[in-house]
Amino acid sequence: MIRRRVVRAVMMTPDRHVLLMRVQEPVSGIEFWVTPGGGLEPGESDEDALRREVAEETGATKVSPGQLVWSRQCDFTWDNRDYSQHEYFYRVQTDRFVPVMDGNPAQGEASAFLEFRWWSFDDIGRSEETFSPRDLHSLLEGLSRNEPPEGPADEGV
């Protein structure tokens, strides 16, 4: 089992949109939407890891990590490897930009990436797509009202 600490950017615009990435698990083919982020390197702070991951995955280089808004523990299998990771989600206020994934050094990660999309909170609530965390819509709604979640984010996908 691979254990790791992960940081994720909840990149929100003033008009209630959030940047998500659609990814596909290589073995099962299951597709779902996630926030940009990834694992910390040895000695790296959460803030530095978040800046690095966002730059690698979206091309955005002027990211100012905001407050820690959610955390969760999740166990899953990816590419026939078992993971146990603790994820920390940081709010990042931003204007919309056109994301590009050309700085990701891990080819395996780049090949699992399918697309970016700026989702409105309302569209997430109405969608039949799969999001990670599964309760992303309610978490975003609470965040927009400055209400902390009652517990950890749903482990979901």
Where are these regions (language model features)?
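Hydrophobic (often cysteine-bearing) scaffold residues that line and stabilize catalytic clefts
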Residues: 3, 42, 46, 132, ...
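A conserved beta-turn-beta hairpin within the catalytic core of GNAT-like acetyltransferases
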Residues: 27-31
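Conserved N-terminal beta-strand and adjoining loop/helix that marks the start
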Residues: 1-19, 39-42, 66, 89
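Unchanged
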Residues: 40-64, 72-129
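Short, acidic/hydrophobic/Gly-rich beta-strand patch recurrent on exposed beta strands
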Residues: 21-23
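Acidic surface patches and DE-rich sequence motifs
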Residues: 13, 25, 78
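A short gly/proline-enriched turn/hairpin at secondary-structure junctions
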Residues: 33-35
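Charged phosphate-binding loop/patch that engages nucleotide di/tri-phosphates or the phosphate backbone
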Residues: 127-157
